[in-house]
């Protein structure tokens, strides 16, 4: 496998890690300093550019020109609230370039600005070099991980960073998914297990629920916060000590970037110490205006400073359980990923939430993601080793996918959180007599009406042979592959004519915020949606009944059985209702129900003599404003044909 080795890179907010799968196992590769994780830092000086440990080590001397946290900027707009709030904490300068954030630094005596992708690509280049030094040959193929909540532009920008670093990015995979792969290889026991992965890193927090069964991984739900991690805990400590310095020495150090940076370094060290000891001391010589700052902090005080952040980690856990439709008792394993999960209070909160369940700490939390990425890279390169042979990875669709049926109703074929790859087929029919074609409009979203959802694409299937409404059978298939690319095909069963559209998830898809917003809106508007659904159902039921009555009395087979007077009475009333419908499409449910009862009072006595029952149910279909519905009036979906 020598030359076409593929590596797995965990590109973290604060630290990155690289692994390679060879000789049947994963090696996490140490850098030139002997560290298995490398700071995601890039520094620019008068003479050189430093990446990794070298950059982080000189940060106190050169804070304005040392860039970190590029992952917080990547794929975001300058005006983004997250970018604006983060800028307050950064010692380096972020400038606006056409609503794209750029980092401005002095390098070799001149001012330079870089896009976040460029900074991340420098970190990726460093990780690539670490792997090459270990393997002894060039490496180009890589799998790079991102938080589960990264939106499309953030994923695309991360991929771009890989390309800038000279990597062939085989795939971008979710960090929790990667951790699950690492975990899956460690656990080859049989039987289905539900695993909750709690990933609290330097900058992002992800909760994922996966089902692992005999080498098959299935992501059931993901939740999290793109802005919670170890750095936020450091910020709390920094603020605490800035206040303490003010109290003790009557001086404000917060505007002195170098002093704040030295304090932050000491705080990070103290935080790590507090994971194993109950007290940590800080000793910083000549922190500000020649004043030495010697102080200490207890674990209890640290927990108090961050208590809301720690407690807040349980909300995404609850949300993921809700989305996966699981009770906490159904989770078999709790897996900790990310350096911040070493904090005893975080472990205790999670353990208490799960009623004292043991936590799995068997995987080094800093390395699990890179480990899984390395395994995935080997799979994609076609590694034949038996350890990875039986491993299959399934992701989920973040939003429901469906099409518009008559009346603007959203009919979902693939439900939110369905496992991908997946394929769903449903049969639809026409809405009007001799309809020559149907327009297939593909939407994503959770709302009842398509106008509240996101249109992904549309196409037409024409050339349907003339036939009464409800007769043609049009089979629509939604097929999503492993990369999230959607193919929608429509086939007319009688002629075999087909048409299709391919929707890739490249550009302009919904961001995490929009997805969350749509789901929240869907919950908020559920009541409105119900009213609308009922209204459309009542309207469809009325229209269907009117058309059925009309066609029933016009049936040739009834000649002689039905007096002309009765026939005229029914037809006139039906025509009156149909005309009323045309001019009152926005009436409310009660009016439609009332009209239907009025029509039934005229028709039922006449028809019951001829038929037992009240006419055949109408067929549904695609169409203009109004879909017909079976006489049942049970809901807004179109009639499905078996």
From Swiss-Prot:
It holds the Pfam family HSP70. In response to cellular stress, acetylated at Lys-77 by NA110 and then gradually deacetylated by HDAC4 at later stages. Acetylation enhances its chaperone activity and also determines whether it will function as a chaperone for protein refolding or degradation by controlling its binding to co-chaperones HOPX and STUB1. The acetylated form and the non-acetylated form bind to HOPX and STUB1 respectively. Acetylation also protects cells against various types of cellular stress. GO terms for cellular component: cell body; centrosome; mitochondrial matrix; mitochondrion; zona pellucida receptor complex. The modification Phosphothreonine is found at residue 637. The modification Omega-N-methylarginine is found at residue 469. Testis-specific. The modification N-acetylalanine is found at residue 2. The modification N6-acetyllysine is found at residues 77, 108, 246, 348. ATP binds at residues 12-15, 71, 202-204, 268-275, 339-342. Keywords: Acetylation, ATP-binding, Chaperone, Cytoplasm, Cytoskeleton, Methylation, Nucleotide-binding, Phosphoprotein, Stress response. The modification Phosphoserine is found at residues 632, 634. PROSITE patterns: HSP70_1 (PS00297), HSP70_2 (PS00329), HSP70_3 (PS01036). Its main location: cytoplasm. The modification N6,N6-dimethyllysine is found at residue 561. Residues 2-386 are annotated as: Nucleotide-binding domain (NBD). InterPro entries: ATPase_NBD, Heat_shock_70_CS, HSP70_C_sf, HSP70_peptide-bd_sf, Hsp_70_fam. The modification N6,N6,N6-trimethyllysine is found at residue 561. It is found in: Cytoplasm; Cytoplasm, Cytoskeleton, Microtubule organizing center, Centrosome. The N-terminal nucleotide binding domain (NBD) (also known as the ATPase domain) is responsible for binding and hydrolyzing ATP. The C-terminal substrate-binding domain (SBD) (also known as peptide-binding domain) binds to the client/substrate proteins. The two domains are allosterically coupled so that, when ATP is bound to the NBD, the SBD binds relatively weakly to clients. When ADP is bound in the NBD, a conformational change enhances the affinity of the SBD for client proteins. May be an auxiliary component of the CatSper complex. Identified in a IGF2BP1-dependent mRNP granule complex containing untranslated mRNAs. Interacts with CHCHD3, DNAJC7, IRAK1BP1, PPP5C and TSC2. Interacts with TERT; the interaction occurs in the absence of the RNA component, TERC, and dissociates once the TERT complex has formed. Interacts with TRIM5 (via B30.2/SPRY domain). Interacts with METTL21A. Interacts with PRKN. Interacts with FOXP3. Interacts with NOD2; the interaction enhances NOD2 stability. Interacts with DNAJC9 (via J domain). Belongs to the heat shock protein 70 family. This is Heat shock 70 kDa protein 1B. It comes from Mus musculus. The gene is Hspa1b.
């Amino acid at each position: 496998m020598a030359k076409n080795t593929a590596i797995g890179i965990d590109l973290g907010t604060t630290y990155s890690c690289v692994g390679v799968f060879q000789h049947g196992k994963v090696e996490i590769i140490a850098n030139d300093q002997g560290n298995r994780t490398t700071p995601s830092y890039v520094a620019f000086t008068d003479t050189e550019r430093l990446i990794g440990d070298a950059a982080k080590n000189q940060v106190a001397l050169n804070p304005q020109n040392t860039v970190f946290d590029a992952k917080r900027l990547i794929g975001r707009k300058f005006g983004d609230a997250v970018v604006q709030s983060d800028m307050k904490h950064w010692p380096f300068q972020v400038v606006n370039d056409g609503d794209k954030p750029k980092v401005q630094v002095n390098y070799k005596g001149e001012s330079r600005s870089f896009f976040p992708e460029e900074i991340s690509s420098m970190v990726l280049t460093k990780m690539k070099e670490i792997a090459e030094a270990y393997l002894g040959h060039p490496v180009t193929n890589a799998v790079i991980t991102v938080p589960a909540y990264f939106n499309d532009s953030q994923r695309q920008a991360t991929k771009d960073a890989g390309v800038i670093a000279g990597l062939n990015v085989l795939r971008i995979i979710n960090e929790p998914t990667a951790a699950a792969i690492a975990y899956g290889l460690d656990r080859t026991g049989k039987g289905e297990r539900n695993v909750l992965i709690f990933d609290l890193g330097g900058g992002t927090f992800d909760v994922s629920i996966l089902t692992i069964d005999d080498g098959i991984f299935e992501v059931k739900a993901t939740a999290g916060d793109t802005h919670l991690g170890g750095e936020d805990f450091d910020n709390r400590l920094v603020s605490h000590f800035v206040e303490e310095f003010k109290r003790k020495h009557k001086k404000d150090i917060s505007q002195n970037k170098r002093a704040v940076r030295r304090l932050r370094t000491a705080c990070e060290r103290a935080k790590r110490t507090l994971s194993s000891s109950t007290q940590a001391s800080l000793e910083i010589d000549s922190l500000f205006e020649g004043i030495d700052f010697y102080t200490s902090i207890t674990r209890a005080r640290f927990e108090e400073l961050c208590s809301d952040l720690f407690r807040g980690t349980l909300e995404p856990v609850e949300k993921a359980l809700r989305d996966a439709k699981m009770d906490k008792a159904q989770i078999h394993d709790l897996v900790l990923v990310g350096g911040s999960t070493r904090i005893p209070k975080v472990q205790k909160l999670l353990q208490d939430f799960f009623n004292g369940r043991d936590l799995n700490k068997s995987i080094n939390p800093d390395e699990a993601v890179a480990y899984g990425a390395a395994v995935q890279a080997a799979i994609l390169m076609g590694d034949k080793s038996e350890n990875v042979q039986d491993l299959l990875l399934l992701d989920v669709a973040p939003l429901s996918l469906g099409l518009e049926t008559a009346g603007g109703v959203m009919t979902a074929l693939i439900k939110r959180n369905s496992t991908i790859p997946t394929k769903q087929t449903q049969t639809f029919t026409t809405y009007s007599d001799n309809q020559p074609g149907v327009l297939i409009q593909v939407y994503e979203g959770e709302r009842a009406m398509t106008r509240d959802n996101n249109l992904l694409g549309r196409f037409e299937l024409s050339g349907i042979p003339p036939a009464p409404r409800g007769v043609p059978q049009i089979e629509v298939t939604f097929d999503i592959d492993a990369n999230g690319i959607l193919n929608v095909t429509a086939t007319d069963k009688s002629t075999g004519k087909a048409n299709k559209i391919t929707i890739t998830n490249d550009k302009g898809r919904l961001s995490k915020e929009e997805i969350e917003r749509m789901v929240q809106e869907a919950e908020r508007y559920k009541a409105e949606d119900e009213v609308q659904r009922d209204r459309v159902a009542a309207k469809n039921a009325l229209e269907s009944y009117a058309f059925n009555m009309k066609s029933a009395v016009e049936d040739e087979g009834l000649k002689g059985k039905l007096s002309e007077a009765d026939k005229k009475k029914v037809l006139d009333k039906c025509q009156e209702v149909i005309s009323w419908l045309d001019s009152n499409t926005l009436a409310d449910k009660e009016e439609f129900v009332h009209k239907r009862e009025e029509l039934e009072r005229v028709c039922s006595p006449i028809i019951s003599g001829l038929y037992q029952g009240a006419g055949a149910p109408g067929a549904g279909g695609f169409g203009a404003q109004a879909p017909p519905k079976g006489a049942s009036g049970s809901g807004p979906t179109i009639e499905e044909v078996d």
